[in-house]
Amino acid sequence: MIATTNRHASQREIVPATKSLARVSSIGARSFLLEAPGDFDLVAQRRIWALSQTVKDWADLAENIPGMTNLLVIFKETPEDPDAVVSRLLEAWENARSIDLKGKTIEIPVHYGGEYATDLPALCDLSGLSDREVVRIHHEATYRVFALGSAPGFGYLHGLDPRIYMP
């Protein structure tokens, strides 16, 4: 059983009526977005990567784009039965097992202070940390690229220490 809620003409949310473990929304006529439940974390992202690997071989799929704990799938043609697509995606999600993608470490030079630190005083005020503590915490961390952005070279990163998070 599928419950459907119209949000506006080009997007409708389609969720399972009995379980809301993952949420699927239609984005236009040929695209669907599966959003992982729970927190923004590596566990959910690893399942998204696994789901992306699973659906890439679907013959009717034009493209799949992993995002931040979500996956956008774009079909070659408008599906005749959107509810069947939702069921297929949710089943694939339920069967997805965590994977870890091989990558490489890239060191990015960072300049702390001066004209590059316009938000550092606000961060220090919010966190209660000194500027040296903020720099140390930020510098010691290793960040993982969860997804690529729409601009070349832009990566969405995970791994920021909560002590230096800015809303």
For each predicted feature, which ranges?
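Conserved "landmark" site that anchors the functional core of diverse proteins
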Residues: M1-P167
